Amino acid sequence: MLYQFLLNFVDTFGFLNVFKYITFRTGLSLFTSLAIVLLIGGPFINFFSNRKILDPIRDDGPEDHIIKKIGTPTMGGVIILFGLLVSVLCWGDLSNISILFCIYITISFGLLGAFDDYKKIQHNNSSGISSKFKILSQILITILGISFFVYFVNYQEITNLYFPFFKNLIINLGWFFIPFSVFVIVGSSNAVNLTDGLDGLATVPVILVAGCFAFISYVTGNIVFSDYLQIPYIEGTGEVSIFCGAIIGSCLGFLWFNAPPAKIFMGDTGSLALGGSLGAVGIITKHEIVLAITGGLFVLEAVSVMVQVISFKLTGKRIFRMAPIHHHFEKKGWPESTIVIRFWIISIILAMIGLATLKLR
């Protein structure tokens, strides 16, 4: 809104032309969301603590984990999403369908996550709403959003699936694009949610993936760069860089409070929304497979849970001491800081591989 307001004065004040540059507004978006989260983080934590908005800890988890985490406020995703959305509303082009789709997914998944967090706090356990209700709600939200997006987006090849490393390998998914998009967005949302189990564990990988896609969305929306890199050019996609910048800034601000020992957890309010929004960005930029590479840590965490469940149902035995896999290493006696930093290193490597796919074709 602020961006569109300033455009009215470009002819009078020539220096305002700088706001037309996506890179400049991406930087503004990052620093705006960062500043907002840093400013409101402390008061929000005090408010949540005083109101006993505390995270119910799994009683079957590692003993050291239970002792350290008890009494920590949750629903910190409210802080993240507030900073993110205010920043995007200020510096994004709100007439852009891609930006609107990202905002829709973020708000919808955030509200669903907040409802889940509320139920956990209300009943003082880590169960919250049922898995069936959560997934069904995510599917319905995504179907509605992706249907409108496909209808209004100005890109005829939106249903194409592009493969990294192979410039001519393209599959037109047709109507299967909608269930595929649902799988990507819902899967991404729940994968980030599963990863958010240790202080700062999910936050840094989210920042890394958002950083990669800030670059990817910019070059995808630039006809010169997209032609040079031999990736699909999608008009208007560059605006998504501003959304990604807001994610980076708000998560950096949140990490200030979420770094070990965490003063607050993001809860499902943050993890479901951030995961869903990254999935949406992957769909918009037509880099869904690259999303799975850069967000490989999230994939690993989700797969570890699925493998654990399938193994137990088929054989009665568990492959891991506890799932998701970060709890397995906790059970083995690894210090929390060791697990978190090593998983961050994995995320950095995967992010570099994901970016390398843009050139290696």
Which residue stretches match the model-derived regions?
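Membrane-interfacial loop-to-helix junctions in multi-pass inner-membrane proteins
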Residues: 95-103, 122-137
